[in-house]
């Protein structure tokens, strides 16, 4: 998907968008991908910076927009 989480924002009524900080299952990260019904998140503690799918309302807390996006090392 390439609509920057528009479906997720509308359907689930959450502020999901690429670049927003989140806490997923107690771990902090950043949304980096629109995955249709899911959001693609890179967790801060993942050294390989892999994008993982998360449901937008299950164990998810939304924060502010990130100032920088993580890069793969």
Q: Where are the regions a protein language model picked out?
A:
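Intrinsically disordered, low-complexity linker and terminal regions at domain boundaries
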Residues: 66-71
């Amino acid at each position: 998907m390439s609509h920057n989480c528009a479906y997720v924002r509308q359907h689930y009524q959450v502020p999901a968008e690429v670049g927003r900080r989140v806490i997923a299952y107690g771990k902090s990260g950043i949304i980096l991908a629109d995955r249709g019904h899911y959001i693609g998140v890179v967790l801060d503690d993942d050294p390989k910076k892999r994008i993982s799918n998360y449901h937008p309302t299950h164990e998810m807390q939304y924060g502010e927009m990130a100032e920088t996006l993580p890069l793969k090392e």
